[in-house]
Amino acid sequence: IVGGTDAVLGEFPYQLSFQETFLGFSFHFCGASIYNENYAITAGHCVYGDDYENPSGLQIVAGELDMSVNEGSEQTITVSKIILHENFDYDLLDNDISLLKLSGSLTFNNNVAPIALPAQGHTATGNVIVTGWGTTSEGGNTPDVLQKVTVPLVSDAECRDDYGADEIFDSMICAGVPEGGKDSCQGDSGGPLAASDTGSTYLAGIVSWGYGCARPGYPGVYTEVSYHVDWIKANAV
């Protein structure tokens, strides 16, 4: 997250760290969001090329805030199955969404909780909050503490003006400030973009891609969750 501030424990109870384990060490590489006790939502490009039926060495951590400290609130569960969207396009990042089936159930509390989905076809508006442990500048360092930043949503028309009409699909939603300086970045991928224009918080986007990070005139591009609600409900079973 570029231009963000530290979150506090329990502020984003739906945020997950999606990690790879290797020789006893765990490495954060993407974000994810809690859908229910047994499923998480992340980006397709975070899992592309993995063994979807029998993934090994993948885990999610819920209730995490500071990666360098054991807060006692963490819940770590391995990923038992990956459900990648059947129309995911790795080159164009169309339909950049996947589900992670967990090998056990999360226990919900003040620090670990699901995030609601919008109605299928809902158009999010206003300001949104994006969170993650990704780099705090383009090509920069990663923070220990979860970062948050608030940015306004950008219309599809404006985003197509910025990137080109052939780059922004209906399955995408854009957010950012015109002058740059606030954005998601490498390592935030798969994580949540939360909106609340309905009066309660819901998952509006999944961190997907962008031209660099926080560059003027190039908003962050996210998977539009309202485009995929029916798919999520049909596959998280």
From Swiss-Prot:
Catalytic activity: Preferential cleavage: Arg-|-Xaa, Lys-|-Xaa
SUPFAM superfamilies reported for this sequence: Trypsin-like serine proteases (SSF50494)
Subcellular location: Secreted, Extracellular space
UniProt-listed GO biological process terms: digestion; proteolysis
Cofactor descriptive note: Binds 1 Ca(2+) ion per subunit.
EC numbers: 3.4.21.4
Molecular-function GO term, any one: metal ion binding
Disulfide-bonded cysteines: 30-46, 159-174, 185-213
One protein family per Pfam: Trypsin
Site keyed Required for specificity: positions: 183
Signal sequence extent: none
Cofactors that this protein relies on: Ca(2+)
Binding site for Ca(2+): 64, 69, 74
Active site: 45, 96, 189
Further remarks about this protein from its record: Trypsin I is one of five forms of the enzyme known to be present in crayfish. This protein is more acidic than mammalian trypsin.
Family statement: Belongs to the peptidase S1 family.
Protein name: Trypsin-1
